[in-house]
């Protein structure tokens, strides 16, 4: 999501929007997953995004119908485009044909970031999901929409995945008064994984004179002018074979590495040995070569040491740079209870020097996140699961929402509360209650939450496998029953999660309020009532010394005679 400023100076960083460096995508190809799924994760991170599950039912429209386009970020009206006669069912960012689209915003060159088109990046995602059946078709439709109606956002990286293929598409507008965009899309090789996190990542590629969309041998698509436009704008003067999309249209800088690429590094490091060679780069040390291009960047994709499951994906989304020198649990910013979160802004200055707060994958301002699981060996009627969640990925639970459901569970439905309208009936608010309470004493409280996350996640994985065995037996005979079954299951799982998290908050608040840790005890014989066991944990010696030094002895016990 929005918005990153290129050529960042620290003063500009201080002025960055509330949504800076938002969103993370991890992409797993069929050959890299434990069961042959294609998977893609997405965290929609914004201080002003309310977490809810969008739904567009499949519909038939009269010929000539027009579709209003409203900017996803702001709600601003952008214009109208022709509607197609038939649209598809979309649940969040996954449709009924097992197509999923996610994104992260890299913004790119400022002069290219103010086009006056109709199609913003959010509308491109959700309109395309209603119209496309495969990743290749989605790339064609999305780029055609931009060409026909103009682009209305800054630079974007899109993850476009179906049950067989996973693609990365990077796109940026042409600036004020210029319609369309320049773009390139690459197929991730099977058996590999990729990621992006608010920094453009496609570098060199084999330029295509023609996009033969449905030729399986073509693994690169691009706009005709992706290189010539860069020459026209005096961004590039080398050979076509040397042209790097990212280094030309969104050169990586300190912020792009430290706040963005470091999240890609954390994922890559979790799945493949040897990633320490890119650690200096991820921290923000950029080396430059010909054309000013960075020379020490990470590869666009890597082959993992072992195959990846959806349970692994849930874990990757909870990363806080644990185990690295930037592990946020270990410095003074963590407070006395090892909190791996830092409140914004991410940049600050003192005594004439500039500093940063780290930006990890899991962050407090997430509106919603998901892992799309797309499975070619299952019928589309129940082949795709949108493992959907709300709030901070570090504290959330991913609930299995089949992409064909037609009834969205009430706790996750659009219109059930908003960012300034609290309700206990909303999963977003209940999960925020738990996470925000846990931030106060992370070391003590989070382990209890983690147990509940694992219990629910393993239960959901087991239950979906059992359900799908049953559905395989009936899907050809009774498709209506299949639809009823997936609706019932996803709604039941969501309602159960919502209630369990309300119960969890009640348990945690009762146990940990007022700085104590209370344990219920049985009432002994002969007693009318009995107080709970109360424990009070001392601060670490490190924090005791910090207090002593900061208070300059004022808190020292005065001994008689002193």
Listing of model-derived features with the role each one plays in the protein:
Residues 23-121, 141-308:
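A contiguous strand-loop segment
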Residues 113-115, 123-132:
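Second-shell loop/turn segments in exported
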Residues 267-355, 359-361, 447, 451-455, ...:
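Accessory, solvent-exposed terminal regions and/or long lumenal/extracellular loops of proteins
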Residues 454-562:
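Histidine-centered catalytic/metal-binding microenvironments
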Residues 18-22:
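Sec/Tat signal peptide C-region and signal peptidase I cleavage site
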Residues 1-5:
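Positively charged n-region of N-terminal signal peptides that target proteins for export
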Residues 7-17:
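Bacterial N-terminal signal peptides
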Residues 332-473:
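Substrate-recognition/cap regions that form aromatic- and gly/pro-loop-enriched pockets
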């Amino acid at each position: 999501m929005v918005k990153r400023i290129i050529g960042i100076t620290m003063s500009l960083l201080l002025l960055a929007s509330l949504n800076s460096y938002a969103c993370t995508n991890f992409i797993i190809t069929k050959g890299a997953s434990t069961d042959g799924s294609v998977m893609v994760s997405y965290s929609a991170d914004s201080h002003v995004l309310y977490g809810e599950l969008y739904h567009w039912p499949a519909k038939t429209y009269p010929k000539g119908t027009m579709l209003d386009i409203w900017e996803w970020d702001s709600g601003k009206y952008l214009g109208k485009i022709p509607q197609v006669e038939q649209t598809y069912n979309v649940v969040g960012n996954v449709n009924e044909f097992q197509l999923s689209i996610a994104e992260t915003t890299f913004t790119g060159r400022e002069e290219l970031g103010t086009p006056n088109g109709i199609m913003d990046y959010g509308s491109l995602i959700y309109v395309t999901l209603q119209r496309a059946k495969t990743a290749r078709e989605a790339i064609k439709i999305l780029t055609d929409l931009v060409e026909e109606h103009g682009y209305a956002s800054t630079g974007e990286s899109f993850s476009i995945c179906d049950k067989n293929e996973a693609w990365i598409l990077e796109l940026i507008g042409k600036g004020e008064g210029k319609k369309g965009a320049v773009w390139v899309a690459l197929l991730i090789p099977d058996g590999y994984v990729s990621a992006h996190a608010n920094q453009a990542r496609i570098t060199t590629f084999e330029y295509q004179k023609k996009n033969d969309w449905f030729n399986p041998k073509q693994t690169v698509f691009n706009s005709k002018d992706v290189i010539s436009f860069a020459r026209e704008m005096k961004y590039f003067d080398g050979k076509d074979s040397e042209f790097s999309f990212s280094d030309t249209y969104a050169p990586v800088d300190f912020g792009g590495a430290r706040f963005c690429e470091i999240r890609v590094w954390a994922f890559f490091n979790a799945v493949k040995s040897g990633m320490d060679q890119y650690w200096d780069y991820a921290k923000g040390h950029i080396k430059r070569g010909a054309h000013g291009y960075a020379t020490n960047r990470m590869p666009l994709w890597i082959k993992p040491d072992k195959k990846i499951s959806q349970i692994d994906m849930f874990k990757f989304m909870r990363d806080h740079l644990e185990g690295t020198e930037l592990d946020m649990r270990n410095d003074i910013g963590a407070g006395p209870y090892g909190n791996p979160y830092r409140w914004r802004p991410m940049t600050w200055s003192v005594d004439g020097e500039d500093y940063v707060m780290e930006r990890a994958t899991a962050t407090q301002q997430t509106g919603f996140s998901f892992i799309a699981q797309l499975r070619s060996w299952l019928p589309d009627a129940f082949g795709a699961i949108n493992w959907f969640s709300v709030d901070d990925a570090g504290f959330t639970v991913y609930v299995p929402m089949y992409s064909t459901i037609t009834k969205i569970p009430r706790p996750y439905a659009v219109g059930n509360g908003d960012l300034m309208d609290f309700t206990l009936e909303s999963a977003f608010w209940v999960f925020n209650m738990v996470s925000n309470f846990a931030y106060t004493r992370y070391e003590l409280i989070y382990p209890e939450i983690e147990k509940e996350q694992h219990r629910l996640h393993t239960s959901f994985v087991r239950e979906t496998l059992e359900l799908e065995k049953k559905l395989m037996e009936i899907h050809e005979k009774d498709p209506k029953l299949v639809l009823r079954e997936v609706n019932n299951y996803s709604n039941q799982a969501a309602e159960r999660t919502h209630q369990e998290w309300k119960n969890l908050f009640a348990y945690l608040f009762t146990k940990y309020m007022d700085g104590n840790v209370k344990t219920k005890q049985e009432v002994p014989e002969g007693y009318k009532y009995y107080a709970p066991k109360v424990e009070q944990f001392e601060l670490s010696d490190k924090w005791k010394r910090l207090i002593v030094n900061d208070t300059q002895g004022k808190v020292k016990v005065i001994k008689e005679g002193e």
